[in-house]
Amino acid sequence: MVKVYYNTVQPDLYNQSLHLFSIIGFLLLSLVWWRSRRSILIAWGSLVAWFLVLWLISEHTFEGLVDWARRSVAIGSAYAEVQSLSLGQPILLVMYVVFAIATVILLVRRHRACSSTRTVRIVSSLLVLFMLYAGLKTGFVREGNAHAFEAFALLIPALIWLAAPIRVTVRRLALLALPAVVGISILVGERPAVGSFSSLYNWPEKASVWIDDANLLTSTVVFERKADAARGAAQAFYGLNDDMVRWLRESPAQVDPFDASLIWAYGLPWRPMPIFQTYMNFTPFLDGVTTTALADRHVDDTILIDTSWVGNLDYRLSLWTSPRYQLALTCSWTPIHRDGRWEQWAKNPSGDRCGSPQSIGTENVSANQIVTIPASGPDSFIVATFTRSSAVPTVLAGAINLLYKPLDPFTIRLGEQEMREPPTFDGSRLIVSCPSGLPVTRRYEAVCPSPLTISFSESGTVTFERIPTRSS
């Protein structure tokens, strides 16, 4: 069901529904073809084949797969460093661990009973272990009930696959138990109160929601009515005035940092960045892709910025979410219209307003040492570059970070605000102070009170640079 959810408009329970249909489809295959292992192999083979076809259609080469995999790992590691949350419902993790232990036991039993070649057994074992690992990282890195449901969705096929060599009775019991497991996962997964199973007692309401969803999928009238209601609710939430809507209809826009559903709500022309949710740029590579796209945008393109996110955005400072992109936006773009929390930016007619960075000091700092940021003055920005010491983490900490989530993520404290920053951005220029003569804009509110102090949760070297600017 389409609805307003927090600060965006999205299909309700989209992830859960997607995985539910995937599991149901797999169950049907398994019931028709009792040798579940074959259906799993068919599913994985189809997935790999389609991936390769799409990869080649997109004019990529096989050699590029290695680079793609390397960058994917870097992005995933940075995501875990920045976005990891404390576990809201430990029982979900306990359930997952129990399932994982059962999976490993089944894997061992299967190898003892199976007459397959060693290569087949090794490949199948690696595949099962990968599914366990992917489920753990997906479900419990950035812990949320929907994410935890994804973990079970990844684990359940492994259990079915491994149940294949066991007696038919046990296999049938495993298959019959799956709908109950899926149902519990869905009930637990729909945003219950933290630390409780309160949603388990709301099944009549959930049944009503599922009936509404079925009507939405099968009735054009219901779909249009729900879509109109969602569009109206979204417009009420975003609150753009008529003038801003008119200006945006004249110029294709990118919405920063993430609210692309605004484009749908108002029917606006959209020209997104390659990573259209710019706060998701977790590595210098993604930052560079977005920065290049910003420089290549048409002269009539605009950027619509939601300045209500100047502070904490998923534990990060909005101005630091993509350092090169944010600095390029600061130097080459300018605000042209304002409407409450929204600012429309366009390319600066006179080009880049920033001069070359000038170093004004370097200091070796210990963990959590407070440093005063130099004053910016009326016509210059101050940027800070921090490089962490090459301290080698303990084996235990490294293993935990790889398998689960960082126990002590890297943080930067700016004044009274504590923010996270991906380790991949070591050496990136972060805006820490803005010119006192800056045009009126809320985008820099977090760094404009001067002088601020800054500290880092690890030891390293901090360098401050002054970037001179002109008013136009």
Which ranges hold each PLM region?
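Transmembrane catalytic cores of multi-pass membrane glycosyltransferases
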Residues: 1-129, 138-149, 187-212, 423-425
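Small/polar loops that bind or transfer phosphate-bearing groups
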Residues: 34, 254-255
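Short linear, low-complexity motifs centered on an aromatic residue
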Residues: 87, 164-172, 345-355
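A C-terminal functional module that forms or caps the active site or interfaces directly
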Residues: 132-134
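Hydrophobic/aromatic-rich transmembrane helices and adjacent perimembrane loops
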Residues: 141-171, 175
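An aromatic- and histidine-rich active-site surface loop
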Residues: 148-152, 256-265
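Internal/C-terminal transmembrane anchor helices
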Residues: 169-195
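C-terminal luminal/periplasmic domains and tails of membrane-associated envelope-modifying transferases
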Residues: 209-252, 261-265, 269, 273-472
